[in-house]
Curated annotation (Swiss-Prot):
<keyword id="KW-0732">Signal</keyword>
<feature type="active site" description="Charge relay system">
    <location>
        <position position="355"/>
    </location>
</feature>
<comment type="similarity">
    <text>Belongs to the AB hydrolase superfamily. Lipase family.</text>
</comment>
<feature type="disulfide bond">
    <location>
        <begin position="122"/>
        <end position="294"/>
    </location>
</feature>
<keyword id="KW-0442">Lipid degradation</keyword>
<dbReference type="InterPro" id="IPR029058">
    <property type="entry name" value="AB_hydrolase_fold"/>
</dbReference>
<keyword id="KW-0964">Secreted</keyword>
<feature type="active site" description="Charge relay system">
    <location>
        <position position="205"/>
    </location>
</feature>
<dbReference type="GO" id="GO:0005576">
    <property type="term" value="C:extracellular region"/>
</dbReference>
<feature type="disulfide bond">
    <location>
        <begin position="371"/>
        <end position="415"/>
    </location>
</feature>
<keyword id="KW-0378">Hydrolase</keyword>
<comment type="subunit">
    <text>Monomer.</text>
</comment>
<feature type="active site" description="Charge relay system">
    <location>
        <position position="387"/>
    </location>
</feature>
<dbReference type="GO" id="GO:0004806">
    <property type="term" value="F:triacylglycerol lipase activity"/>
</dbReference>
<protein>
    <recommendedName>
        <fullName>Lipase A</fullName>
        <ecNumber>3.1.1.3</ecNumber>
    </recommendedName>
</protein>
<feature type="signal peptide">
    <location>
        <begin position="1"/>
        <end position="21"/>
    </location>
</feature>
<keyword id="KW-0443">Lipid metabolism</keyword>
């Protein structure tokens, strides 16, 4: 599909207008309920961070959000201790929702929303707050309320970490994965949940990247967590492959955001790139890291940008330290400089074969490699979808899989067998899985503009 600059601009404008119109089911104030994270001490790592254990809650506060109100859920922000890429103790923030009627025994649902930007005020915890002026609000008002609302209907405790951390290190796998695992620990600590509480994870696109890294690091970083399943779709499994796929194309802003995010997580990469930036590159890197420069701006500002035009060295990907970092920031074994782990719990992975934002082939390679090492993966490639339609196609089947994982009833499959999961055909329908109210909300997304500057749909879920 050919995408023009004019079409991207018009779609982003429509997406912004859709957010400002606000969901019909909620009454939202224009201003966020709390200060911008840049002005909020809650987003500052305390000087004694090293005295806290991983996942220990440092401070907490009750917050109003636009999500979970129909379920009478209580929402809180937790500041907790986690670990960065350099294995240093740092603080992070997670939003948690406490169900009005918790399932017994307790179950924990970890949801990773796509943030896809490198500014602190793009963080999910800020976007979730009641209000309309948050710069990344569009990521929190479309399918996200449906997913979290469904989990609360089941009585699951919900945690959604700011997986990019206070540095907003987009696409930095270690940083994201550890932040998520410690966010789950923080929720368990905050609610005094049993040590063996079942945990499941879900994410799409940038949120899927965070999810796959959490699943990959779980066995070594948080082996005590009782993870029973994970679903993720449109997953960027390789930083290098995703960058190469995006650079120079209509969604080149994500390639630039990835360079910015990885550099924020790897100081040696930051120093290396800074020394090679030309004048345009210096200005552009400062811009993408600027306050309020979030997913819509990333997409709108840089279509067809060649990131190499910002530096005086076009061989960066093959030079140290970047070449070595890219071999670390991948879960594809054929590219990795380390042994990629194989999670033991069942997973549901879906992807559009003609995906125009996240390349399909690396994800398929990851599934093949994992299956060869004994993984349990339900693989659902969609041959006639693209990034946004696949997001909707996989939503109901992925949540159904999560419920099965919690119930211990995931289907036995030959790992990696490509079988498209279709709600109402191969899985229960949207009404059966979500209930009629949430199913109708999902159908209402058909044709609405997404945060990616493209519409959901056009196919309405059954």
């Amino acid at each position: 599909m050919r995408v023009s600059l004019r079409s991207i601009t018009s779609l982003l404008a429509a997406a912004t207008a859709a957010v400002l119109a606000a969901p019909a089911t909620e009454t939202l104030d224009r201003r966020a309920a709390l200060p911008n994270p840049y002005d909020d001490p809650f987003y500052t790592t305390p000087s004694n961070i090293g005295t806290f254990a991983k996942g220990q809650v440092i401070q907490s506060r009750k917050v109003p959000t636009d999500i979970g109100n129909a379920n009478n859920a209580a929402s809180f922000q937790l500041q907790y201790r986690t670990t960065n890429t350099q294995n240093e103790a740092v603080a992070d923030v997670a939003t948690v929702w406490i169900p009005a009627k918790p399932a017994s025994p307790p179950k924990i649902f970890s949801y990773q929303v796509y943030e896809d930007a490198t500014a602190l005020d793009c963080a999910p915890s800020y976007s979730y707050l009641t209000g309309l002026d948050q710069p990344n609000k569009v990521t929190a008002v479309l399918d996200t309320p449906i997913i979290i609302g469904w989990a609360l209907q089941q009585g699951y405790y919900v945690v959604s970490s700011d997986h990019e951390g206070f540095k907003a290190a987009f696409i930095a796998g270690y940083e994201e994965g550890m932040a998520i695992l410690d966010g789950i620990r923080a929720l368990k600590n905050y609610q005094n949940l049993p040590s063996d509480s079942k945990v499941a994870l879900e994410g799409y696109s940038g949120g899927a990247h965070a999810t796959v890294w959490a699943t990959s690091l779980a066995d070594s970083y948080a082996p005590e967590l009782n993870i029973v399943g994970a679903s993720h779709g449109g997953t960027p499994v390789s930083a290098k492959d995703t960058f190469t796929f995006l650079n120079g194309g209509p969604f080149a802003g994500f390639a630039l955001a990835g360079v910015s995010g990885l550099s924020l997580a790897h100081p040696d990469m930051e120093s290396f790139i800074e020394a090679r930036l030309n004048a345009k590159g210096q200005q552009t890197l400062k811009q993408i890291r600027g306050r309020g420069f979030c997913l819509p701006q990333v997409v709108l500002t840089y279509p067809f940008l060649n990131v190499f035009s910002l530096v005086n060295d076009t061989n960066l990907l093959n030079e140290a330290p970047i070449a070595g970092i890219l071999k670390q920031e991948t879960v594809v074994q054929a590219e990795a400089s380390y042994t990629v782990s194989v999670p033991k719990f069942p997973r549901f992975i879906w992807h559009a074969i003609p995906d125009e934002i996240v390349p399909y082939q690396p994800a398929a390679t990851y599934v093949k490699e994992q299956c060869a090492k004994g993984a349990n993966i339900n693989f659902s490639p969609y041959p006639i979808a693209e990034h946004l339609t696949a997001e909707i196609f996989g939503l109901v089947p992925s949540l159904w899989f999560i419920k099965q994982a919690f119930d211990g009833t995931t289907p036995k499959v030959i790992c990696g067998t490509p079988i498209p999961a279709i709600a109402g055909i191969t899985t229960p329908s949207a009404d059966q899985v979500l209930g009629s109210d949430l199913a109708n909300q999902l159908r209402s997304l058909n044709g609405k503009q997404s945060a990616f500057g493209k519409p959901f749909g056009p196919i309405t879920p059954p």
